[in-house]
Regions:
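Active-site-adjacent structural elements that line small-molecule/cofactor binding pockets in enzymes
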Residues: 1-254
């Protein structure tokens, strides 16, 4: 059980810690905590919370992680940062998982992935977002080559703990499509990406992307296995459980 992305800019981390600890206790220690710095300006505008520059939001996220871990620890916790001040907060209840539930951080840029490498247990490999009033995916960051670069950043920042990290990916280059003609679907996908972003990706780059899942049941089973072997990715968020159920059966026991 877990959250994919909780926008910490919309929630005070000390209050969030109590909510998350309660969920972990009630679930018998099954919670995973997905956190993020926020990216969707309209989400902020709708409730009157300023949408700050990305660097400020990442600093808020960094402080929030420190506060969550402090609140989950034993005894009162105090913290004085640029964005939050905590004074003698007990942080009850405490989570069932000690020292805390696994933290899931993801991103496509070096700053967020470096933070994730230092603080998280699960790291989501995401495409980079081009900032603006309506952020959009940088299509170039969907490729396998871009993923290799992201993993290098993570390895450098994680140091000795790299082997303890779980790497995750999910379909952000379009929906999962089960088909016996993957190249035709990949050409359509490449055409849409070119029309929307101006970026030219080849059919091979589309099919090779860790963020695109197109092919037959056997194709997709091979791809999941290849992502584990090639990149060390062992965690996947999928967008169509029914379509991929045969893939899971194909991979059972591997």
């Amino acid at each position: 059980m877990g959250t994919f992305v909780l926008n910490v800019c919309l929630r005070h981390p000390a209050v969030l810690a109590q909510d998350l600890a309660t969920l972990d206790v009630l679930s018998g220690g099954r919670l995973e905590i997905g956190l993020g710095a926020g990216w969707n300006k309209p989400e902020h505008d709708a409730i009157g919370i300023p949408f700050e520059p990305v660097g400020v939001r990442i600093k808020r996220l960094t402080e929030a992680i420190t506060i969550l871990k402090g609140c989950f620890a034993e005894g009162p916790f105090s913290f004085s940062g640029e964005h939050y001040i905590i004074t003698g907060h007990d942080g009850a209840p405490k989570p069932a998982q000690r020292p805390h539930p696994p933290i899931f951080l993801g991103g496509g840029g070096k700053r967020l992935l470096t933070l994730a490498a230092r603080e998280a247990q699960i790291i989501g490999l995401a495409p980079r977002l081009v900032q603006g009033d309506a952020p959009r995916v940088d299509a170039r960051s969907l490729t396998a080559a871009a993923t290799e670069e992201k993993i290098r950043w993570i390895r450098e920042a994680a140091g000795d703990r790299f082997g303890e990290l779980e790497l995750n990916t999910y379909p952000t280059g379009g929906p999962t499509v089960v088909t016996d003609d993957p190249r035709a679907e990949a050409r359509r996908r490449a055409d849409r990406i070119r029309e929307q972003t101006g970026v030219e990706l080849t059919v091979e780059e589309i099919l090779d992307s860790p963020h695109v899942f197109i092919g037959s049941i056997k194709d997709l089973a091979r791809k999941f296995a290849d992502l584990r072997e090639r990149f060390g990715i062992s965690s996947f968020l999928i967008d169509d459980l029914d379509a991929l159920a045969p893939v899971v059966e194909e991979l059972a026991g591997q």
